[in-house]
From Swiss-Prot:
PANTHER family documented for this protein: 40S RIBOSOMAL PROTEIN S29
InterPro entries, A to Z: Ribosomal_uS14, Ribosomal_uS14_CS, RIbosomal_uS14_euk_arc, Ribosomal_uS14_sf
Pfam families attached to this UniProt entry: Ribosomal_S14 (PF00253)
Encoding gene per record: rps29
Binding residue positions for Zn(2+): 20, 23, 38, 41
Protein name (database record): Small ribosomal subunit protein uS14
Entry keyword Ribonucleoprotein: yes
Domain of life: Eukaryota
Family (UniProt): Belongs to the universal ribosomal protein uS14 family.
Length: 55
């Protein structure tokens, strides 16, 4: 019964409404510069996007 109602309510705002564009994760989303990627995917793709690591 309860599983039928799981995530049926529309997510228009809040952390549940935003997903990673690569993996679909809801946690750790980087929205700055309109990246919309989770931090894990960003670490793997940062060099390809054009971000440089200076340390």
């Amino acid at each position: 019964m309860a599983r039928e109602l799981w995530l049926t309510h529309p997510r228009n705002f809040g952390p549940g409404s935003r997903t990673c564009r690569k993996c679909g994760n809801h946690h750790g989303i980087i929205r700055k510069y309109d990246l919309n990627m989770c931090r894990r995917c960003f670490r793997t793709d940062a060099e390809a996007i054009g971000f440089n690591k200076y340390r």
